[in-house]
UniProtKB/Swiss-Prot annotation:
Native organism: Rattus norvegicus
PTM annotation: Phosphorylated by CK2 and dephosphorylated by PP2A. Phosphorylation of GGA3 allows the internal DXXLL motif to bind the VHS domain and to inhibit the recognition of cargo signals.
Subcellular location: Golgi apparatus, trans-Golgi network membrane; Endosome membrane; Early endosome membrane; Recycling endosome membrane
Span(s) of short sequence motif DXXLL: 391-395
GO cellular component: early endosome; early endosome membrane; lysosome; protein-containing complex; recycling endosome; recycling endosome membrane; trans-Golgi network
InterPro entries in the record: Clathrin_a/b/g-adaptin_app_Ig, Clathrin_app_Ig-like_sf, ENTH_VHS, GAE_dom, GAT_dom, GAT_GGA3, GAT_sf, GGA1-3
Region ranges (Disordered): 334-385, 400-419
Quaternary structure and interacting proteins, as annotated: Monomer. Interacts with GGA1 and GGA2. Binds to clathrin and activated ARFs, such as ARF1, ARF5 and ARF6. Binds RABEP1 and RABGEF1. Interacts with the membrane proteins M6PR/CD-MPR and IGF2R/CI-MPR and the accessory proteins SYNRG, EPN4, NECAP1, NECAP2 and AFTPH/aftiphilin. Interacts with TSG101 and UBC. Interacts with ADRA2B. Interacts with NTRK1; the interaction is independent of NTRK1 activation and ubiquitination. Interacts (via VHS domain) with BACE1 (via DXXLL motif).
Name of the protein in its database record: ADP-ribosylation factor-binding protein GGA3
Modified residues (Phosphoserine): 159, 275
Compositional bias per record (Pro residues), positions renumbered to this chain: 343-363
Gene: Gga3
Pfam families documented for this protein: Alpha_adaptinC2, GAT, GGA_N-GAT, VHS
Gene Ontology molecular function terms on file: phosphatidylinositol binding; protein transporter activity; protein-containing complex binding; small GTPase binding; ubiquitin binding
Length: 727
């Protein structure tokens, strides 16, 4: 066999399909399959090479190419299945059997083999719908008269799904202990093993009961939400009967009661549990339909326009139709370069409770996220703030983390320039944070009328139950224009010094974390938090108080025995772990041209529909920061459609920090077979001073052609922490 070193896919295929071969050479066929699995773009290159060989005028070469294709489908996995399942490759196969193209010049043996492969794939790969469409089209055109027989030895058997793991019986420590006890000849050990088995069975029964209860709760919530949503769609104040109104009130009460149940379920669910997404989606739908009921039936304007309506719900959400609190992930939503940068004004001395921004508000009726962009006018304040209620749930549960952006080296009016010198890299991960803006039409506002700013853009998640559109007459519009930002959080109480503005110290951040937890407790117990004033934090430090405004509390709390203000300081301190200066990445910036690649293999973070994201690891750490891993994020497009509006956000646990530097672009051109794939690069910095195992979550938003997509994922295949700086 030829040496594998230096062999390319083309050389492997040329040897495997050589017309001079007397028989199929499986040595080279398997070598070709292995090379596909090794190469980053192996499947994309392989299908192009195979399509050319299959259309060869030499029958023996074409038959060998089809044998290679069949072997690849069995050995190269889903990546190759996705490429073969695209019309680009299927059209090449159809040309072989269609009399309009090559059908009259291709032998019957080759055509029969192609039809046989297509039919076997329709049975073995039902998820590849395009293969089935192509085969049925051939049948409709009469090219395929009947389904060919498929020998058992040539049937494509997909890889079986992984065996579902039982967390109780797959516990490594218990399994080792049980095996040790069972091997023992001591009767006491056998008795202990018997007790251990019984306890494991009980744990498994409790787990099954918990899962059953969760499924029942989710089903009940979804049924109530669906029924209430449909009744609200057909509600008319003049023509709806009292019975309908009573039924809607009963459904509304049920939905309110289920909020806390869902919040409890989410808090009890592990981060890596697949059911967490279903719980959050159900909570998202529940919050949306509750807000719709309050708006349509009770006439409330949600989130800030009527002060009695701005109390956050029991889950800590502040919903607002097509606007909401951004998920506290990588802060990559860039403000318009025309946004003014306001200098902090002198503020009165701070009190024991730091000032927190109230929930955001909307200047129009609540609407579903799926329709907000289509219905809203093109102005920046109405289209760019279509944010996700699911993001709010992630934010409140502490499952999402911020990753601040780095300043660009070039100055000017670039949107990234506004992120320079921000203190947000010291903010806490996984702690509930209200990164939002709001306004109040009342005279007690702490800010003068805000200057008109350009809002930030965030791709919305589709709404499962879009909220009904409320007539404009039922809405009292706000007078201000506000900006939401997933960018750096502003200084809450800036101090006045001769040298210039100064951002709050870490102790204030700790008190913020403690108050965040108090707010969460207050929302769950009795909904005591009622903002009486509103202000708008922007992406840069903005004045929160005019110089002449006296200090006064923003958040009145009830003083009953259950009030969170009576909780012990020890409880309050649990809001956030102590953060040291070594976590900060604000001053760390790594130019792309200075990065040296390492020998570590890249990790595929996302690969779907021809859009792929890879993590490449740098050889060295930034100077003076051996705890920081430098990752180059490569985004590739092999799809025939352009990919636009690409935004990548990242999150890590509290003991780490992550920062995404500005990407080289936000659009990828369509794939062309005569040109290399379009690519975007973005540098990501990951600080891990505690040397813990890295678990990074990401949120990816993009538009493939005209279709908007939002993807969530997790990556944990990082190099060992001990090898950072010497990869």
């Amino acid at each position: 066999m030829a040496e594998a070193e230096g062999e390319s896919l083309e050389s492997w295929l040329n040897k495997a399909t050589n017309p001079s071969n007397r028989q199929e050479d499986w040595e080279y066929i398997i070598g070709f399959c292995d090379q596909i699995n090794k190469e980053l773009e192996g499947p994309q290159i392989a299908v192009r090479l195979l399509a050319h060989k299959i259309q060869s005028p030499q029958e023996w070469e074409a038959v060998q190419a089809l044998t290679v294709l069949e072997a690849c489908m069995k050995n190269c996995g889903r990546r190759l299945h996705n490429e073969v399942g695209k019309f680009r490759f299927l059209n090449e196969l159809i040309k072989v059997v269609s009399p309009k193209y090559l059908g009259d010049r291709v032998s019957e043996k080759v055509k029969a083999k192609v039809i046989e492969l297509l039919f076997s794939w329709t049975l073995a790969l039902p998820e590849e719908a395009k293969i089935k469409d192509a085969y049925h089209m051939l049948k409709r055109q009469g090219i395929v008269q009947s389904d060919p027989p498929i020998p058992m030895d040539r049937t494509l058997i997909p890889s079986p799904p992984p065996r579902p793991k039982n967390p109780v019986f797959d516990d490594e420590e218990k399994s080792k202990l049980l095996a040790k006890l069972l091997r023992s000849k001591n009767p006491d050990d056998l008795q202990e093993a018997n007790q251990l088995i019984k306890s494991m069975v009980k744990e498994d029964e409790a787990r099954i009961q918990k899962v059953t209860k969760r499924l029942h709760t989710l089903e009940e919530v979804n049924n109530n939400v669906k029924l209430l949503h449909e009744m609200l769609l057909h509600y008319s104040q003049e023509f709806s009967s009292e019975a309908d109104k009573e039924l809607m009130k009963e459904l509304f009460d049920r939905c309110e009661n289920k909020r806390r149940t869902l919040f409890k379920l989410a808090s009890e669910t592990e981060d890596n549990d697949n059911s967490l997404g279903d719980i959050l989606q159900a909570s998202d739908n529940l919050s949306r339909v509750i807000n719709s009921y309050k708006t349509i039936i009770e006439g409330q304007i949600i989130n800030g326009e009527v002060t009695t309506s701005t109390v956050p719900d029991s889950e800590g959400n502040s919903h607002c139709g097509n606007q909401g609190a951004l998920i506290d992930l990588a802060e990559l939503d860039t403000p318009s370069s025309s946004s003014p940068v306001l200098a902090p004004a002198p503020a009165p001395p701070t009190s024991g409770i730091p000032i927190l921004p109230p929930p955001p508000q909307t200047s129009g009726p609540p609407r579903s996220r799926s329709s907000s962009q289509a219905e809203a006018p093109s102005g920046p304040d109405s289209t760019n703030n279509a944010l996700s209620l699911l993001d709010e749930e992630l934010l409140c549960l502490g499952l999402s983390d911020p990753a601040p952006t780095a300043p660009k080296e070039s100055a000017g009016n670039s949107p990234w320039h506004l992120f320079q010198n921000e203190p947000s890299s010291d903010l806490d991960f996984f702690s509930p944070r209200l990164v939002s803006a709001a306004s109040c039409p009342s005279e007690g506002s702490l800010l003068p009328p805000p200057v008109s700013t350009s809002s930030l853009s965030q791709a919305p998640l589709p709404a499962a139950f879009p909220a009904p559109v409320v007539p404009a007459s039922a809405v009292t519009h706000s007078t201000g224009s506000f900006t939401f930002s997933s960018g750096p959080a502003p200084a809450l109480v800036p101090k006045a010094e001769p040298e210039g503005p100064e951002y709050p110290s870490s102790s204030i951040s700790h008190r913020l974390d403690a108050l965040d937890q108090l707010l969460e407790e207050a929302k769950v117990t009795s909904g005591l938090v009622k903002p009486v004033s509103c202000f708008s934090p922007g992406p840069t430090a903005s004045p929160l108080l005019p110089a002449s405004t006296p200090a006064r509390p923003l958040l009145p709390f009830s003083t009953g025995p259950g009030s969170p203000l009576f909780q012990s300081p020890a409880f309050q301190s649990q809001g956030s772990p102590q953060k040291g200066p070594e976590l900060s990445l604000a001053s760390v910036h790594v130019p792309l041209e200075s990065i040296k690649p390492s020998s570590a293999l890249p990790v595929t973070a996302y690969d779907k529909n021809g859009f792929r994201i890879l993590f490449h690891f740098a050889k060295e750490c930034p100077p003076g920061r051996p705890d920081v891993l430098v990752v180059v994020v490569s985004m590739l497009n092999t799809a025939p459609l352009p990919v636009k509006s690409i935004v990548l956000q990242a999150a890590v646990p509290k003991s780490m920090k992550v920062k995404l530097q500005p990407p080289s672009g936000t659009e990828l051109s369509p794939f062309s077979p005569i040109q290399p794939p379009a690519a975007i690069t973005q540098v990501m910095l990951l600080a891990n001073p505690m040397k813990e195992k890295v678990r990074l979550r990401y949120k990816l938003t993009f538009a493939l052609g005209e279709q908007l997509s939002t993807e969530l994922g997790e990556v944990d295949q990082f190099p060992p922490v001990e090898q950072w700086g010497n990869l």
